Amino acid sequence: NTHLRLEADNFNLDGFDVAPGKKSKALVMTFKRPEEVVGNHIAKYQALRLSKMLMAYDFDRKLCAFAELGGFIFTFMGDGKPGTGKTTLIQMMAGMIDGYCKVAGYPFRYQNLGIDTVDSYQGKSGQNAKSFITSVMDPAVIGFGTIDDIDQVAGKRGERGSSAGQQEITAVLMEAFAGANTVVRGNCTFGMFSNYPENVDDALRQRAG
């Protein structure tokens, strides 16, 4: 939070949050090298390919050649039984992009939308999800956003077990991934991961890839 004091008026301003994306923290994460990821060679190859695609982003034009010509993967879903390496794949891909960005001198931003995003206050969950999307899609950075255990974070519409907060997140993600105002510049990608993809809202699952 920001604290300001206007001496002339003897007036304090407290509690203003810095706008999302304006203040970046150093990425602290356990990275995995590609040679440490054994098995699941198709998913591994696709993750490596996507990491390289992101490096084709032109910061002057604010557009990636793959997004312009086709073939860019803006959203994807990784599913599988527990222990099949979904988190390892995230660590490998984030590590590859981070390494490439360091060599190229590009700013890299990684964020995860976790279960702690779901809030009991009306509208707050959707606001948290929107902040996550805005931060990752910032055209001034290379972004990688993940939604781990998306079946717990985003709720199925019309299902009695889904909270209002989960449904807000579903609505925000659907609008961001394939809404009327969605602009795919090719500077970022979003990965959704779940052990139970059948529990994810059908329309949201269809937006993966």
Where are these regions (language model features)?
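Pre-Walker A (pre-P-loop) alpha-helix and adjacent loop at the N terminus of AAA/AAA+ ATPase modules
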Residues: 29-74
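A short beta-strand-to-loop transition that corresponds to the Sensor-1 phosphate-sensing loop
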Residues: 149, 188-197
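Substrate-gripping "pore-loop 1 plus following alpha2 helix"
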Residues: 125-131, 158-188
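Conserved P-loop NTPase "ATPase switch" module shared by AAA+ and STAND
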Residues: 139-165
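Interdomain "pre-motor" coupling segment immediately N-terminal to P-loop NTPase/helicase cores
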Residues: 1-30
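Short glycine-rich substrate-engagement loop in P-loop NTPases that contacts/grips substrate
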Residues: 107-139
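Walker A/P-loop
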Residues: 68-110, 134-135
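A short helix-turn-beta junction within AAA+ P-loop NTPase domains corresponding to the substrate/partner-engaging
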Residues: 202-209
